Amino acid sequence: MATSSSAWLIFSDHYREILIAIACLVVFSLLRSARSSSKGGLPYNWPIFGMLPAIISNNQFNDFTTARLRKMGWTFIFKGPWLLDMDYIFTCDPSNINHMFNDNFENYPKGELGKVFDIFGNNIFNADGDLWHDHRKMAQTILWDGNYRTMQATFIRNKMDNALIPILDSAACKRNPVDLQDVLLRFTFDTSCFSVLAADPESLTMEFPPVPFSKAADQALDAALTRHITPRLIWKLKRFFNVGSERTLAVAWKVIDSYIYDKIAELKAKRKLVGKINSYDAVSFYMDNFNIHDDKFLRDNAFTYLLAQRNTQSLTMTWLFYALFENPKVELKILSELKSIVDESSERKFNDGFALFDSNMIQSAIYLHATLCEALRIYPPVPFEIKDAHKADVLPSGHKVRAGEKILFSPYAMARMKGIWGDDCLEFKPERWITGNGTLKHEPAYKFFAFSAGPRICLGKELSFTQMKMVVATIIYNFHLQMVKGHVVEQSNSILMDMKHGLMVQVRKRSVM
C-alpha cells in the first residue's frame, strides 16, 4: 500500500511537471507569436479574446491604431472575442470613406450604433432615412438664418469682452497660470447655451464655478466609448443591473436632462408671460418656425447642438494653441495678418486697450483660416467614427464587408499617412491650405474629414470657422501665451480629442496696437 502511494506521488509530481512545462511552452509560443505579429503590423489574435487585449492594454488608442494602419496599407481586419460580434474593419483609406459617405451612403446608416448613443435621443445625430432628412432640413433653416448668426456673433463678441479678455488679463497681471482648455470649454459652453436655449450659464467667470452639465456630458461620452469596446451583452447586463460605467451614465443622464428640461421650461414660461419674443435661439426657432413644442423633441435636439458647439470648437482651438507653442513662426504670421486687418479696418473695436475681432473683420484672415484647417487635420476633435453595414459590400480597398459588420475609420490616422497628405504630413504647415494665388485651397471632405462628408456633412461648418476665428484672433492679437514649463500634453482615451491634463499656460499682454 505504501509502495503504491509512493508510486502515485512520484507519478503525480512528474505529471504536474509535464503540465507546467507544456503550459510554459504554450505561453512562450503565444508571446513569441504575439511579438512577431505585432512587428508585422497586426495586434496578436489571441484564442477566445481575439485582438481586444491589445486595445484595452494600450493607453494611446489613436496612435496605436495609426501605427497599425500605416503598416497594413491603411486597412486591416480587427478580430474581436469569439461569439461576441466584435469584429471590425479598421481603415483610414479616403476611397473607403468616400464609398461609405458618398457612393454607397444608404448602406451605412447609424443603425445599431444609435443605441450606443441613446442618450442623444431621436435627433439628427442618431436618425436615418426620412426622419434624418426632416431633422436636417430644420437644422439647415436654423443654422443658415441671418438673425440666428447675427445673434450668435454678437453674444460671442460680448462674452469675449466681458469674460474671456478680463480672465486672461487677470492671469497676465497676477502671473497665474490658467488651463486654456478649461477656459475655452467654459467659453463655448456659455455661447452654445445661449444660441440653443437663450440662457447664459456664466460658467466662464473669475471664480471658475463647477459646471455639473459639462461634467455629466463628458461622463456620458466616456460611457459611450466603453460601450464601443465592450461586448454588447456585457454593457446591456451592466445597464440592467445599474453597475459600473452604466451606473455613471444613468446618473449623468439625469443631470443632463434636468438642466435642459429646466431651461426649456424657463423659456416657455417667459414666452407665456410676455408673449412671443424676438429670440433666435434654436429651441425658440423650433417652436416659432416649425410649431414644435414637445419637450422630448426639444431636449434631444438641444443636447446635440450643445455638444456639437461646445466640444468641437473648444478642443480645436485648444490644439491650435498647442501647435502654435510648437511652431512659433506660425503665430508670428497670424499676428502679422491680424495687424494688417486692424490697420485697414474701418470697424475697429477696442475696449480698455484690447482689440475685439468681429465676424466681418476676420473674413480676410486667410492664414488664420488655414491654420485652423491644419489644426483640424492633425488634431480632429472626433478622432475616429464607426459605421454599420446594412448589407454585404466590398470596399474600394478590396475588403469584404458582411451585413451588420462594423467599420472604424480614423481621420486622426489619415492625417498621418504620407500617401494621403505627402511626406510632410506630420508637420504643422498651414501653407498646405493656401494656393499660389493666396486663396484657400479646397480638399475633398473624405480626405479632410473634420466636418464629416457626403449628405451628412456638417451644416454649421462655415459658422464654426467664423466663430473660432473671432476667438483665436482676439486672443492672439491681445495676448502672448506660453505653455507652462514641464506641463505634459497627452490625449485622453476618449471619443473626443481632449487633453488629459488640460493645457496650462502663462499669459502675457501684447503691445501691438
Swiss-Prot record:
It catalyses: 4'-O-methylnorbelladine + reduced [NADPH--hemoprotein reductase] + O2 = (10bR,4aS)-noroxomaritidine + oxidized [NADPH--hemoprotein reductase] + 2 H2O + H(+); 4'-O-methylnorbelladine + reduced [NADPH--hemoprotein reductase] + O2 = (10bS,4aR)-noroxomaritidine + oxidized [NADPH--hemoprotein reductase] + 2 H2O + H(+). GO terms for molecular function: heme binding; iron ion binding; monooxygenase activity; oxidoreductase activity, acting on paired donors, with incorporation or reduction of molecular oxygen. Keywords: Alkaloid metabolism, Heme, Iron, Membrane, Metal-binding, Monooxygenase, Oxidoreductase, Transmembrane, Transmembrane helix. It is an enzyme of class 1 (oxidoreductase). GO terms for biological process: alkaloid metabolic process; lipid metabolic process. GO terms for cellular component: membrane. The chain crosses the membrane at residues 18-34. Belongs to the cytochrome P450 family. Cytochrome P450 that catalyzes an intramolecular para-para' C-C phenol coupling of 4'-O-methylnorbelladine in alkaloids biosynthesis, including haemanthamine- and crinamine-type alkaloids, promising anticancer agents. Catalyzes the formation of (10bR,4aS)-noroxomaritidine and (10bS,4aR)-noroxomaritidine from 4'-O-methylnorbelladine. This is Noroxomaritidine synthase 1. The lineage of its organism: Eukaryota, Viridiplantae, Streptophyta, Embryophyta, Tracheophyta. The gene is Cyp96T1.
